[in-house]
């Protein structure tokens, strides 16, 4: 991984970790919050905690307005752009002959340009050129991270297909209680108002994570998942970047 992205991951883990000292927490934001002129109050993230509800007696995602105050406003823009960069970099193909620093600058400019296009289309209520790409290649309408005792799992919401794409923390190899983790993520989809209308949870697990890949594939029928065929390499319209989902085993769960 490029050093620039490693630092961004560390920043995300630090901020989310400070919010998740007691159980799991979800920190997310809408891409349109990055529009120029957005006031600081509207930059606040959506925060949910996975905890026992006095209403039901079971763990569920509950809004945490007090917790949102603990994320300093000065960090929010940096956190949001870091989340976008790290999620999109997971699917970007780095040419072996290109120097890392030069590639990163090109990648960063490319992503910023496409985020701007997504914001403009959303603000004007019109279809976006992004929508023709496969889900993993699209700039998301929302980005977020779930922090728990097993790591920081990243996600993005693709409105055009109504799918939530989740990247399991690659550092959590072999340590995830898959049943509990999947229930928690499905309940995030069910309980988060900004994800209403979600039709599928699409989980991306690194092929190098042999333990979790094996467990997921072995229990596909039991957990109600469907193995999704990889799309492979896809160029962007300007042919500046190549995206690919080949690094991952992709499993879809209907919501």
Swiss-Prot record:
Protein name: Ornithine decarboxylase antizyme
Protein family according to the UniProt entry: Belongs to the ODC antizyme family.
UniProt source species: Eremothecium gossypii (strain ATCC 10895 / CBS 109.51 / FGSC 9923 / NRRL Y-1056) (Yeast)
Gene field: OAZ1
Pfam families tied to this protein: ODC_AZ
Gene Ontology MF, one: ornithine decarboxylase inhibitor activity
InterPro entries: ODC_AZ
Origin superkingdom: Eukaryota
Physiological role: Ornithine decarboxylase (ODC) antizyme protein that negatively regulates ODC activity and intracellular polyamine biosynthesis in response to increased intracellular polyamine levels. Binds to ODC monomers, inhibiting the assembly of the functional ODC homodimer, and targets the monomers for ubiquitin-independent proteolytic destruction by the 26S proteasome.
GO BP term, pick one: viral translational frameshifting
